[in-house]
Amino acid sequence: MTLWINGDWITGQGASRVKRNPVSGEVLWQGNDADAAQVEQACRAARAAFPRWARLSLAERQVVVERFAGLLESNKAELTAIIARETGKLRWEAATEVTAMINKIAISIKAYHVRTGEQRSEMPDGAASLRHRPHGVLAVFGPYNFPGHLPNGHIVPALLAGNTIIFKPSELTPWSGEAVMRLWQQAGLPPGVLNLVQGGRETGQALSALEDLDGLLFTGRANTGYQLHRQLSGQPEKILALEMGGNNPLIIDEVADIDAAVHLTIQSAFVTAGQRCTCARRLLLKSGAQGDAFLARLVAVSQRLTPGNWDDEPQPFIGGLISEQAAQQVVTAWQQLEAMGGRTLLAPRLLQLETSLLTPGIIEMTGVAGVPDEEVFGPLLRVWRYDSFEEAILMANNTRFGLSCGLVSPEREKFDQLLLEARAGIVNWNKPLTGAASTAPFGGIGASGNHRPSAWYAADYCAWPMASLESDSLTLPATLNPGLDFSDEVVR
């Protein structure tokens, strides 16, 4: 029984599903998808639970959420192993994900008060108040690259605001989704407040098509986000938050410490086997001898990166991709770029058949026309050379995406120029593209999102503002508007 609906674990009535470790092939999870009727059942449960949950005080809802944080802490080792084994991540990185989940609780509570709490301003004849109210029933679609942390970034603020939820994890990470749901169960969430439906495309389509849905919060690929946007078009009454991918540029300008710049680039491009939406996909490198030296050093260090299994000791820098198919897609993308005229500097290699262990790849595309503006979700870095900083900014903005952008340079003036001209929601200076502050919004523009950034700003899309003018008594104004006559004279 792998679905959690209205406080009960039940068996899915849809297609059967088996999840294997993408490196070892070990069977980790077996179950069945939710069919359309079970998705509707989950929605009815969430709708029935909404009035009571929304009427609880914030303090009462916060108690449950903080209890969940405590369970994350006490089950950290177990959840770390589940996420690592299911995604192919290494133990060290999965542990940082669980830590991020724990930290998200306090951050979300603070963000609720700062961004969507209550405010009151006294006026001569009363007061003006601002309150926030939950939307109702929200669907949360989780991604596979951070199956605990990223859905958590939607679920926690949505619950704090008083919403009820139907959560569909990625079909590639059902075990992680179930493990997190069982912790919420232990935390004492009332039945129907959070419901878990497992499944792939058919389950997702049934969920997004629900008429009695007040909104949808999505993290994933741009193509899926676009489909959801089209599906919900003409329904302005529903909140839609889309956090999608990017074709992110990293500009390497003048470099004082080549090894430091190489380290930053590897952290930007190859961490999590290149499976972060903010990863650098395009390296824009200044022409000249210094750029040549940097590129040679980047290739030399990157070719030492050997991916390994989640529990290998000593721990490698990168693990496997989410699946053998995902790894093969990266290899295919590299082959296509090479066929277009790209110059391979470091060829990506599958270490073993039927596994997702893939070494990083680097290919130079300078002067090649018609390179697709697409996100290759894996450890493949494309390189372009530029002559002037103005040209670098034009190249950086030459994408339909707009998630992250970075600059390596000692010159503050160039960063200030980039801040003015970059089209990206995250713009970093001498910091990895994959770094983000928990007290800042997380999201992009263009094909990277629909102006609903998450993280610190997630509270914004989990509640709607209600403005009030208030007075505890009603009296006739001392001064009336022209044309109003409240005298006792009888009009003849």
From Swiss-Prot:
Please name the InterPro entries in this protein's record: Ald_DH/histidinol_DH, Ald_DH_C, Ald_DH_CS_CYS, Ald_DH_CS_GLU, Ald_DH_N, Aldehyde_DH_dom, SuccinylGlu_semiald_DH_AstD
Listed EC numbers: 1.2.1.71
Any one GO molecular-function label of the UniProt entry:
succinylglutamate-semialdehyde dehydrogenase activity
**Any Pfam family hit:** Aldedh
Q: Oxidoreductase among the record's keywords?
A: yes
- Which residues does the annotation say bind NAD(+)? G220, R221, A222, N223, T224, G225
Source organism's superkingdom? Answer: Bacteria
Q: GO biological process annotations for this chain's record?
A: arginine catabolic process to glutamate; arginine catabolic process to succinate
Q: Which Gene3D superfamilies match?
A: Aldehyde Dehydrogenase, Chain A, domain 1, Aldehyde Dehydrogenase, Chain A, domain 2
Which reaction is recorded as catalysed by this protein? N-succinyl-L-glutamate 5-semialdehyde + NAD(+) + H2O = N-succinyl-L-glutamate + NADH + 2 H(+)
Q: Which residues form the active site?
A: E243, C277
Q: Which UniProt keywords apply?
A: Arginine metabolism, NAD, Oxidoreductase
Q: Name the pathway it acts in.
A: Amino-acid degradation; L-arginine degradation via AST pathway; L-glutamate and succinate from L-arginine: step 4/5
Main EC class of this protein? oxidoreductase
Which family is it part of? Belongs to the aldehyde dehydrogenase family. AstD subfamily.
**What does the UniProt record say this protein does?**
Catalyzes the NAD-dependent reduction of succinylglutamate semialdehyde into succinylglutamate.
Protein name as it appears in the record: N-succinylglutamate 5-semialdehyde dehydrogenase
Q: What is the lineage of its organism?
A: Bacteria, Pseudomonadati, Pseudomonadota, Gammaproteobacteria, Enterobacterales
